[in-house]
Amino acid sequence: MSEQAIRLTQYSHGAGCGCKISPKVLETILHSEQAKFVDPNLLVGNETRDDAAVYDLGNGTSIISTTDFFMPIVDNPFDFGRIAATNAISDIFAMGGKPIMAIAILGWPINTLSPDIAREVTEGGRFACRQAGIALAGGHSIDAPEPIFGLAVTGVVPTERVKKNSTAQAGCKLFLTKPLGIGVLTTAEKKSLLKPEHQGLATEVMCRMNVAGAAFANIDGVKAMTDVTGFGLLGHLSEMCQGAGVQALLCYQDIPKLPGVEEYIALGAVPGGTERNFASYGHLMGDMSREVRSLLCDPQTSGGLLLAVTPDAEDDVKATAAEFGIDLTAIGELVEARGGRAMVEIR
């Protein structure tokens, strides 16, 4: 089979961050009866489902460590590698850090897909690493039934500038740096519903580096930050709210959306991960239409940064975002938790 005829998405049962194990099932997997190992230098572990682990070196600098990998979300091998690498590197930026090195994770069905195609995937990953200013320094590969690619990434951050997903405050405004709808558009493409004018839009967004995260970390008023990926905006916002003991009020009209996303939802281009996300987080939502639910639960691959920002820092955040070509509008706010109210409400 020629490389031109290859459609990588046909060789996997899932796609991108939509491959994630559902939060409910993950809770069961991570539950342990063993005594927890306590290390006072481990600033961020898995307690709040943050984007990466952070370890204090004791000299004012902390190490950030993360890994992320998945099955193809696009058919083009180079783009798949680039998207997977960009997505993995994003975790470093989401913690406020700068990446310094990456190693590759490759699973490949050697008897089904040519090694030349795997090389193209790896080249896409190398390209993304170069964009981030780091080396793809090594990696590990296995013969696997489905194609898998991703990175383990190491970064650094001044300890006082670490941004967590659990330290938001009531009164903070919420901002999102990329539009939602990646899962919807990629599903529409698989179903041959995608219009010509929307071809390539999702890929362009997924390949956009969240490098602004390191700059946002220098703003004191950025109280919490995370990237929106496989659990959708609802899932990652819920984790932010749970960690801080606050509730969120969202303005649906102000949430950035990819062109055509509402039309494709109406046509049924909703990925399976959307329902898994709703099953895990739907009980935290207020009343909303199926269309709104489908967008908020849409699994994002290499999605944008979600920021909780104090009102006095709003102008600084917008100005910093503009330096990276990002036009920010508040999508909602955080309020004090109150009984009888949903954790996430839509206005």
From Swiss-Prot:
Keyword Magnesium (UniProt): yes
Binding site for Mg(2+): D51, D91, D227
Gene: selD
Any one Gene Ontology BP term: selenocysteine biosynthetic process
Keyword field contains Glycoprotein: no
Site (Important for catalytic activity): K20
SUPFAM superfamilies (UniProt xref): PurM C-terminal domain-like (SSF56042), PurM N-terminal domain-like (SSF55326)
Name the record gives this protein: Selenide, water dikinase
Subunit structure comment from the entry: Homodimer.
PANTHER family xref list: INACTIVE SELENIDE, WATER DIKINASE-LIKE PROTEIN-RELATED, SELENIDE, WATER DIKINASE
